[in-house]
Amino acid sequence: MFEKKKRLGLIVYLYYNRDARKLNKYGNVVYHSRRMRYSVLYIAQDETDKIIEEIGALKFVKKVLPSYIDTIDQNFVGSLMR
């Protein structure tokens, strides 16, 4: 049967927009902002350290940040009643 793999989101800030498509070989690019010059991509969680180092060493990458969506409390019950 199919097993769901754990994934991690990465925010990659770029120097130039034309280099955004080069990130496709590292993971699934789900969003690219041309105005802010960043891309959001998902990678397998078991390979995160290696891939973050590889992407960070590329000449067209300004910085790489991991997504913190897993650490944010997503229980919104009662937050609208304040």
Curated annotation (Swiss-Prot):
Keyword field: Cytoplasm
Coiled-coil features, chain-numbered ranges: none
GO cellular component: cytoplasm
One matching Pfam family: DUF2129
Claim: Plastid is one of the keywords in the record: no
Domain of life: Bacteria
Keyword Cell membrane: no
Subcellular location, record wording: Cytoplasm
NCBIfam families to which the protein is assigned, alphabetical: PRK02302.1
Xref: HAMAP family: UPF0298 (MF_01126)
Record family assignment: Belongs to the UPF0298 family.
Name of the protein in its database record: UPF0298 protein SMU_1670c
Organism of origin: Streptococcus mutans serotype c (strain ATCC 700610 / UA159)
